[in-house]
Structure formats: C-alpha cells, structure tokens
C-alpha cells in the first residue's frame, strides 16, 4: 500500500486531450482513483495548450493551478512575469479560479533547442533565480526524470541540477553571497 502523506499529485494529461474535455475528465478521474488524492494541479504535455479553451476546461474539471505557461524553445517569462496570476477569461470577461504559474526553465529547452551544456546549467539557473528573488517571484523549472538519470545524453546534468537547486533553496533564506558560500 502506498501512503501519500506529504505529496502533491499533479495531473499531466496525455498529448491528445488538450482540447477534449471528456478525455480530460476521464484521465483525471483515473489518476484520482489510483492515488485516492484530489488532483488540483496540472501541466500539459509538451506545454501544448490552446488559449483560452484549455484553461477553461481545466477550471471546469476542478484544476486550480497550471504550470504549462512557458516556452519550449527558449527560457524566460512567456507571460512577462514570474509571479503567479489568475487566468483572465476574455470570452467570459471574468477572472477565473485557475492560477497560472509561469515556467521559466526547462531541461530540454536548454540542451536540445539552445545547445547548452551541463557546465552552463548552474550559471543559467542561478541568474534567473536571483532575478526572480529581486521581485519576490516564483521560480518554476521543469526537469524530466531522464535528464536527471545521468545517462550518456544527459551526462553531468544531475550533478549541476542538484548544485543549482541547493543554491536556489539557500537563496530563499540568505542573500546571494551567503547562499553561494553555503551551497559549496
């Protein structure tokens, strides 16, 4: 038996359901039945969504937070902000109950589309984390399990990711210099 005490279970619907509410409901229900947890957060596969329909459907099925708002080919702030905000439904002219959490960095973006190496990862992540801290924003990154596997294609990435996460965690508490010193 699996116990879910301090875990948050997120929804990662299959690629084909971004505009199919029936399949979206079916997949979410299946996940909730398996985990016995009410699922309230989401990230679309390949960051694929259709504006505004996908966000409207998420709200309809009880999702309260989404983490799909990022670039697949670039790093940076797709919504021009690193601060979560409620989706404004232009069709219904209202603020929805769905909070969007902008995604700033994704592993595949760095390696595949931007040609970055593992040696560059720490500097890139720490630079964004420092900028985000200055405005009290939220640092949302996306790293897939295979990029942390240290296999041939991703060799060196896990170590640099761990180093960056350690620094970013300390940056929550300390200033830049102290966080850097303590992360070594």
Residue ranges and their predicted role:
Residues 1, 15-24, 43-52, 73-78, ...:
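Acidic-and-aromatic substrate-binding clefts and catalytic sites of carbohydrate-active enzymes
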Residues 1-39:
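Acidic, glycine-rich loop-and-beta core segments that form the ion-binding/anion-interacting portion
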Residues 4-6, 119-184:
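C-terminal domain-boundary segment and adjacent tail
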Residues 11, 44, 141-143:
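Conserved beta-strand positions
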Residues 14, 101-106, 143-146:
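Short loop/turn segments at strand-loop or loop-helix junctions that form parts
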Residues 19-23, 116-120, 156:
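Alpha-helix N-cap and loop-to-helix initiation/capping positions
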């Amino acid at each position: 038996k699996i116990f879910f005490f301090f875990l948050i279970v997120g929804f990662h619907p299959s690629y084909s359901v971004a505009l199919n509410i029936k399949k979206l409901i079916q997949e979410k229900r299946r996940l909730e039945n398996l985990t016995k947890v009410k699922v309230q957060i989401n990230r679309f596969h390949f960051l694929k969504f259709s504006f505004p329909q996908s966000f409207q459907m998420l709200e309809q099925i009880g999702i309260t937070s989404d983490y799909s708002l990022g670039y697949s080919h670039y790093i940076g702030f797709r919504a021009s902000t690193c601060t979560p905000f409620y989706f404004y439904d232009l069709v219904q002219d209202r603020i929805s109950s769905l909070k969007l959490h902008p995604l700033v960095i994704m592993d595949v973006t760095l390696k595949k589309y931007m040609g970055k190496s593992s040696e560059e990862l720490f500097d890139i992540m720490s630079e964004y984390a420092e900028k985000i801290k200055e405005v009290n924003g939220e640092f949302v990154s996306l790293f897939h399990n295979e990029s942390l596997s240290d296999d041939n294609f991703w060799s060196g990435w896990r170590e640099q990711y761990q180093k960056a996460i350690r620094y970013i965690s300390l940056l929550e508490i300390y200033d830049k210099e102290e966080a850097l010193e303590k992360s070594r």
